[in-house]
Amino acid sequence: KFLKKVKKHPLNNKKLFSYICDASNEDEVSNFFKQINKKTKKIDSLINNVGIAGPTGTIEKLNSKDWEKTFKTNVISHFYFTKLAIPLIKKNKGGSIINFSSGAGIMGFPLRSPYAASKWAVVGVSKTLAMELGKFKIRVNVICPGTIKGDRMVRVIRDKSKFLKVSKKKIEKEFISMASMNCWIFEDDIGKMCSFLISDEAARISGQVIGVDGNAIRLD
């Protein structure tokens, strides 16, 4: 759906470029950057926002494939993209990298251990990158979205409802109540934070973990 919107956008082929690849496949990411290098010699920003919810269940009921798939998508993909983007951002004499974590990356998250572990890893890598890349004027920050209303949360609520054998409505209310503001987060909320962090207004902000979550106070 998103790519269709991009292709129909009046700026497509002028300022917008769309490309489909499996972010968890190193060869496909490499091919993506080959296409980027044909179009430009430098970039100013990278936003790593790919991620999956992972399985729902207690740890003794999960298997290694559950963990591997979650980490490959949520963490290793960030490595693939960041490694190839850094030289292009250096050529720009600085820029911004935004990595997406979650409230689960700063708190525990019952029944979602692979997801929580992967999101904590994103925070650790980002903090380290901020230290390594600061001398190149490259800022690295983390966004931790709250409960975003959309297709992904529909699947998460469905899976948790099935596992706990309770109604979807009950699970939905529980997710909303995790934030002190008792609200959903919307895609535009996240987009606005991204726009700020890649702008010159955030020129001195790096190494930060920023929640856009209505003040999430628990994950349970």
Label for each model-derived stretch:
Residues V142, K165-I205, V212-G214:
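C-terminal helical subdomain
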